[in-house]
UniProtKB/Swiss-Prot annotation:
ATP binds at residues 8, 11, 91, 137, 140. GO terms for biological process: RNA repair; tRNA 3'-terminal CCA addition. This is Multifunctional CCA protein. Residues 225-326 form the HD domain. It comes from Chromobacterium violaceum (strain ATCC 12472 / DSM 30191 / JCM 1249 / CCUG 213 / NBRC 12614 / NCIMB 9131 / NCTC 9757 / MK). CTP binds at residues 8, 11, 91, 137, 140. The keyword Nucleotidyltransferase applies. A single active site specifically recognizes both ATP and CTP and is responsible for their addition.
């Protein structure tokens, strides 16, 4: 029995990054031998065991063969005769196909160390094409490490897309990988990589459709809608925003892809126009409710937020109510963060002032000070309660607006 650390733990150590999880491969052993040594079986599809003390995963060396479309369509073979090199050959990328022995020596039959030094993502073998999830994983690694994709690997991914492999991806796995990619330091790299190989049009056609759509150069010097959305997304990432804000950044301008050509580069009504494509995207990928709902209110209301300083007090109150800000203040503040990213995700506007965020935060705080219950209790005419509460809220908003002007 020979035991090696493999995959991401070796890769990250060589890159000088923290090692979070360690995966192990066991060469020359059998399930019975693993059980006899106290390992606990957990693998449903192939022999994986938990170490009796560390609870880390140990997998028997194996080979794989594709028998059907999709990432479930595999059969595997494991035996004491399967070599370490054969096990590494089934892995996706050269940088993930390096093994480390107990003495620290490395087995790197596919040049992973050289690709790490060069900053290149390269497939190990043509078997890469057998698992469409690998397209998403590679794009995610591009976002994490800001590595280039080897030309031959990009060509292989294009062939996979052309062969319909991307269409075999199931919604849960697509969202799982997209969510991880959104949380990387440079999430735009994931989407641009997917677009380059053609997978974005298959997985997220609503986002892909934004590329090539022009905007007014005076508002958007970057002009291209797709370029803008990528900048917004990267700004949100650089600010350390949570997943829901990053997803809202990705989806806030989907309606611009539907603007009639004769109207371009203006995008009148794109806020409402994006509701249907966003809903379809979220339905198809089974996007979590918190991400879906924040993206929706950001899409519908972001231009009103940008104009916040111009809005009448009653319009500010309507904005707060339409966003359910009085019951969900934390979500409203997240929307403001997405709107800030929208403003600064423009060429040359990366440090633009955005007082709208502080202004609306102050308006929300002032409005929340109104005791609606006390007003209702003191209102003799029950039918007048809503209007009386709104009047009180509008009054504090007006006062806050005047104080803001004075400051």
């Amino acid at each position: 029995m020979e035991i090696y650390i493999v995959g991401g733990a070796v890769r990250d150590r060589l890159l000088g990054l923290p090692v979070k999880d360690r995966d192990w491969v066991v060469v020359g052993s059998t399930p019975d031998e693993m059980l006899a040594q106290g390992y606990r079986p957990v693998g449903k599809d192939f022999p994986v065991f938990l170490h009796p003390e560390t609870q880390e995963e140990y997998a028997l060396a194996r080979t794989e063969r594709k028998i059907a479309k999709g990432y479930h369509g595999f059969t595997f073979h494991t035996s004491p005769e399967v070599t370490l090199e054969e096990d590494l050959a089934r892995r996706d990328l050269t940088i993930n196909a390096i093994a480390e022995a107990a003495d620290g020596s490395l087995t790197d039959p596919y040049g992973g160390q050289e690709d790490l030094k060069a900053g290149v993502l390269r497939h190990v073998s043509e078997a890469f094409a057998e698992d469409p999830v690998r397209i998403l994983r590679l794009a995610r690694f591009a976002a994490r490490f800001d590595f280039a994709v080897a030309p031959e690997t990009m060509a292989l991914m294009r062939r996979m897309v052309d062969d319909g492999e991307a269409d075999a991806l199931v919604a849960e796995r697509v969202w799982q990988e997209l969510a991880k990619g959104l949380m990387e330091d440079k999430p735009s790299r994931m989407f641009l990589t997917l677009r380059e190989c053609g997978a974005l049009a298959r997985i997220l056609p609503e986002v892909d459709a934004l590329f090539g759509v022009p905007q007014r150069a005076d508002h958007h010097p970057e002009i291209d809608c797709g370029d803008h959305v990528m900048r917004v997304l990267d700004y949100a990432a650089a600010a350390g925003q949570p997943l829901a804000v990053r997803f809202a950044a990705l989806g806030h301008d989907l309606g611009k892809a539907l603007t009639p050509a004769k109207v371009l580069p203006r995008h009148i009504g794109h806020e409402e126009g994006g509701i249907a494509p966003l809903a379809e995207l979220c339905r198809r990928l089974r996007v979590p409710n918190d991400c879906r709902d924040l993206a929706h209110i950001t899409m519908v209301h972001h231009t009103k937020v940008h104009r916040a300083l111009e809005l009448r007090p009653d319009t500010v109150l309507r904005l707060l109510k339409d966003c359910d800000a009085l019951r969900r203040p934390e979500r409203f503040l997240q929307m403001l963060d997405a709107c800030l990213a929208d403003t600064r995700g423009r060429l040359g506007f990366e440090r633009a002032p955005y007082p709208q965020k502080d202004y609306l935060q102050a308006q929300l705080a002032a409005t929340l000070q109104i005791d609606a219950g006390a007003i209702a209790a003191g209102c003799a005419d029950k039918a007048a309660i809503p209007a009386t509460i709104d009047a009180a809220r509008t009054a504090v908003i007006a006062k806050c607006k005047e104080e803001w002007k004075e400051d």
